[in-house]
Amino acid sequence: MKGTQTFDAVIVGSGASGGWVAKQLTEAGLRVAVLEAGRTLDPRVDYTEHKRPYDMPFRGRRLAARDRQARQPVQTQCYQCDEYTDHLFVDDIDNPYTTPRDRPFSWIRGRHVGGKSIMWARQSYRLSDYDLKAASRDGFADDWPIDYEELAPYYDRVERFIGISGQAEGLPQLPDSRFLPPMNLTCGEELLRTAMRERFGRTLTIGRTAVLTRDLNGRPKCHYCGPCSRGCVTGSYYSSPSSTLPAAAATGRLTVVDNAVVSHIVVGDDGKCRGVHYVDRLTRNQREVFGNIVVLCASTLESTRIMLNSSSSRHPNGIANSSGVLGHYLMDHVMGGGASGVLPMLRGVEDTRGNRPNGVYVPRFLNIDEQHADILRGYGYQGSAYESKWGHAMSIPG
């Protein structure tokens, strides 16, 4: 075994959760190692939010580069994966996985420092007791073992650091955050908000997004270039490389190990975690890193894989799996459908509000004041209304 190091804590994964754990532990005085399966990005090269279509060989089209489509048949199902961003998503040929033939699953992945916090859509909504204590209201399944009152101080702490812009609405089913100033609605969204309120009594609000509308903690406010999924050289939206990881690094107690593909947790004779075993992605050398604390922040499926692989005499079915439930009842990100339309009364009206990196949200409206026997719980809508540019012509037949 080549190369061993010892830290107070070892974190697997450098995305949204891994960055936060690193910040908290280093600021508490611990020496921390963060292991990331992919490379470290260079914002000057890898972030493409300021590139124009004429800078790209295929003008940024999603499926034009056939070689990329062939190597990324799963990743290109994600609306964020196109010619500008395909390098931020894994190569499906080099990173295969299997599913039952009759139960396919599209696993969207990004292997680099920051993970999918680079490409996420930044929408940030608080859960309420309508979510956490839903079973007490409708009798279905079980309540969470925590309630909103317990979570609220932690929401406050996160929001003060990363910055969430939005509009306070005072809705019990969607608690207000500690907001930065909200972004403006477009003309079409103003019309839609009025119609929904007058006809249905429903609320439409600007999206609650982790994008700065004023300078915060050394990060500048958004300059409305628009395509946040391509990265942000100014760090105006929340990602771990723009906020939590720099904060952890500033303590002098953070070590980031990139290209480290973790295979399993190292367990002592007493059955307790001692560290992790990983393979260097570039050299194929095997190494171990030890720590008194091991935190898995490698995403739902990767963290589960590592735990199942961590079998030992004390944990024959994988660590923390004496019940055999590990690997069942998982929840990853879901994809969705949608619909669109045209507001003819706004034809010819110029949108002068910039390329806003946000949409609108219609909060849950079902089963709030009274229960509907034929529908369980509720849902919200996300969307936007914007001025169509020349690209709309590509979707018109003929």
Can you say where each PLM-predicted feature lies in the sequence?
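A short, glycine/Asx- and small/polar-enriched loop/turn
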Residues: 217-219, 268-274
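Beta1/beta-strand and adjacent pyrophosphate-binding region of the FAD-binding site
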Residues: 3-17
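FAD cofactor-binding and catalytic pocket of flavoenzymes
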Residues: 86-116, 120-121, 144-148, 323-398
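Conserved redox-cofactor binding core of oxidoreductases
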Residues: 58-91, 95-106, 111-112, 118-126, ...
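Glycine-rich loop(s) and the adjacent beta-strand/alpha-helix scaffold that form part
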Residues: 27, 31, 37-57, 251, ...
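Gly/Ala-rich phosphate-binding loop of Rossmann-like dinucleotide-binding domains
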Residues: 22, 26
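Residues that mark the start of a beta-strand
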Residues: 6-8, 30-31, 201-203
